[in-house]
From Swiss-Prot:
Molecular function via GO: rRNA binding; structural constituent of ribosome
Alphabetically ordered keywords of this record: Chloroplast, Plastid, Ribonucleoprotein, Ribosomal protein, RNA-binding, rRNA-binding
Main location per the UniProt record: plastid
One cellular-component annotation, GO: ribosome
Gene that this sequence comes from: rps8
Protein name (Swiss-Prot/TrEMBL): Small ribosomal subunit protein uS8c
Length: 176
């Protein structure tokens, strides 16, 4: 049995992105659903869907239980292994042919490397140590390139939304 579903979700997403998986299955909870909605809205994942699978209970072989899972589709971007200093040099035919070869290389599949959009996920407030902040104390993640996800009285919000609304809450995790 999983006691901390948020840590489990973050660990599953982190491990799947490290091995470049296309999607990952996560146990469904309302909190996990809200975090997945925020990750999709902020552009860290492509999309998600709710899967319902029938499973036979171990204790009662005749009854069936519904296992609801979140299927999260991870997002990657292509990183090119080329030097872009060639782009501003088109003065002779050789440079033009080099430029055309560079364009062919960029369109082709040579030199492409999938890099995850999520660099890291970190659980901040844990079941043993809850961390609460108000909107004035809330720091920025990597100078604004990442987000904090907070549990507030108005629901699950990002740090930017919480600052805009002027409310604080429990800092669940950080994503960058």
């Amino acid at each position: 049995m999983i006691n901390d579903t948020i840590s489990d979700m973050l660990t599953r997403i982190r491990n799947a992105s490290i091995v470049r998986k296309k999607s990952v299955l996560i146990p469904y909870t309302k909190m996990n659903l809200k975090i997945a909605e925020i990750l999709e809205k902020e552009g860290y994942i492509l999309s998600f869907e709710i899967n319902t699978n029938k499973a036979i209970s171990i204790t009662k072989k005749t009854s069936e239980t519904n296992l609801r899972m979140l299927k999260i589709y991870l997002k990657y971007y292509k990183k090119y292994k080329t030097n872009f200093y060639k782009l501003n040099v088109i003065k002779n035919k050789k440079a033009l042919s080099d430029f055309k070869n560079l364009i062919k290389l960029l369109k082709g599949k040579q030199g492409n490397k999938k890099t995850p959009c999520i660099t890291n996920l970190k659980r901040i407030s844990k079941p043993g140590l809850r961390i609460y902040v108000n909107h004035k104390e809330l720091p920025r993640v990597l100078a604004g390139t990442g987000i904090y996800i907070l549990s507030t009285s108005k629901g699950i919000l990002t740090d930017r939304e919480a600052r805009f609304r002027g409310i604080g809450g429990e800092v669940l995790c950080s994503v960058w």
